[in-house]
């Protein structure tokens, strides 16, 4: 199992990238 973290400032696209992962079936913990 791999854990991937998304970091970045406000407006850097974290939510967009997270949604792409969810759309591909990856679990998301916010």
From Swiss-Prot:
Its EC number is 2.7.1.24. Gene3D superfamilies: P-loop containing nucleotide triphosphate hydrolases. Pathway: Cofactor biosynthesis; coenzyme A biosynthesis; CoA from (R)-pantothenate: step 5/5. The keyword Nucleotide-binding applies. Residues 3-30 form the DPCK domain. It holds the Pfam family CoaE. It catalyses: 3'-dephospho-CoA + ATP = ADP + CoA + H(+). ATP binds at residues 11-16. The keyword Kinase applies. Its main location: cytoplasm. It is found in: Cytoplasm. One of its GO terms (biological process) is coenzyme A biosynthetic process. Catalyzes the phosphorylation of the 3'-hydroxyl group of dephosphocoenzyme A to form coenzyme A. This is Dephospho-CoA kinase. The lineage of its organism: Bacteria, Bacillati, Actinomycetota, Actinomycetes, Mycobacteriales.
């Amino acid at each position: 199992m791999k854990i991937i973290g998304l970091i970045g400032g406000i407006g850097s696209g974290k939510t967009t990238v997270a949604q792409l992962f969810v759309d591909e079936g990856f679990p998301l913990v916010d």
